[in-house]
Amino acid sequence: MDITLHLMSVDDKYLLIRLMELYNYEFSAYSNDDINEYGYYGYDHIDDYWNEEGRFPYLIRADGKIAGFALICPHCDYRKEKGARCIGEFFVMLKYRRKGIGLKAVTQLFDKHRGLWEICYWKNNLSAGQFWKKVVEKYTNNHYQTCGTEDNIKTGFTFEN
């Protein structure tokens, strides 16, 4: 399967908003978020991905079809060094999971953006924990550190590539 990343332009903003709703629907099982009175979860930082330096919104395609998205952000939960990056959000649609698409996509992301990385996920999201551990172990050849947030809600990994 051909996996490609496409940097989203501002013209893709409404596509990202729609995909973010799918993501937030699934994520609500962990965050316990509710929809608003208009039937949306919303996402406070959508516009920031086109207005703030260091943010990169990527569309993930599998054989040309939309399969998900990845948002790179400079505001890490744990890592505070200048130039550090984190995966702000990462989503692969259900029909594309467990096929190696997420691993291929995130490997491309790491290769495009060299430097200091932080990957955090909610502790109660066990499938995310399994995915990110596998990705980070494979990508770094087991050269990573573990991290966590002060509120003990998130855990994750840091590394440099």
What are these regions (language model features)?
Residues E81-L94, C120:
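Conserved acetyl-CoA binding element of GNAT-fold acetyltransferases
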Residues N24-D47:
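Conserved GNAT-fold acetyl-CoA-binding loop/helix
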Residues V92, R98-D111:
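Conserved acetyl-CoA-binding loop-helix of GNAT-fold acetyltransferases
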Residues L59, K65-P74, C86, F91:
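Conserved beta-strand in the GNAT
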